Regions:
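C-terminal regulatory/oligomerization modules of transcriptional regulators
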Residues: 1, 127-160
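N-terminal leader segment of winged-helix/HTH proteins
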Residues: 1-28, 32, 79-81
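Pre-recognition alpha-helix immediately N-terminal to the DNA-recognition helix
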Residues: 9, 36-43, 104, 131
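Alpha-helical linker/hinge and terminal dimerization helices associated
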Residues: 10, 14-17, 21, 105, ...
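N-terminal helix-turn-helix DNA-binding core of bacterial DNA-binding proteins
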Residues: 19-65
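Charged, amphipathic alpha-helical coiled-coil/dimerization segments
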Residues: 74-134
Length: 160
């Protein structure tokens, strides 16, 4: 297998996972990014007992532009499932949380997804899952390092 074929294999696997999430979102009448709002808030409420996320955190975690996230939030505000308010601790931040109706909606949307993820993960031993995570992180770190070096070279050339 060539280097290119190995890289293509990684991206095809990532794309396949993304398509599964995209189909789930589509089956519920929303985009993947819209679903991610509910996913991230539910994840936080279960793991951190924090039932909200800031707009900045959404942008960072989804690696999406603020304008895109803002448009998605505006659409979801109209559903009545989420609400947005100014963070009392940092008035420059906006907090996105679920309304009571939104909590029920998010449970119906996200909890079966969490269950499917856990069922899929159960197909692997703990050692296999640890290895999958380690290898994915290793590839991401190596890719980031290589790209940073190339960006640095381009910046140095354009500054000359």
């Amino acid at each position: 297998m060539t280097k290119r074929e190995r890289v293509d294999g990684i991206y095809e696997a990532i794309q396949k996972v993304n398509q599964v999430y995209g189909k789930w979102a589509s089956a519920h009448g929303m985009t993947l990014y819209e679903m991610q709002i509910y996913y991230r808030i539910m994840e936080r409420s279960l793991q951190k007992e924090q039932a909200y996320i800031t707009q900045k955190e959404l942008c960072d975690e989804l690696d999406a532009p603020k304008t895109s996230i803002n448009s998605i939030i505006k659409r979801q505000l109209k559903t009545g499932y989420i609400e947005m308010e100014v963070n009392p601790v940092n008035r420059r931040e906006k907090i996105i949380s679920l309304t009571e109706t939104g909590k029920q909606y998010a449970r119906e949307l996200v909890l079966p997804l969490f269950q499917s993820e856990e069922e899929a993960a159960a197909q692997f031993t703990e050692q296999e899952m640890t290895e999958v995570i380690r290898m994915q992180e290793k590839f991401a770190d190596a890719l980031a390092k290589s790209m940073e070096e190339k960006v640095s070279i381009v910046h140095n050339l354009s500054a000359s």
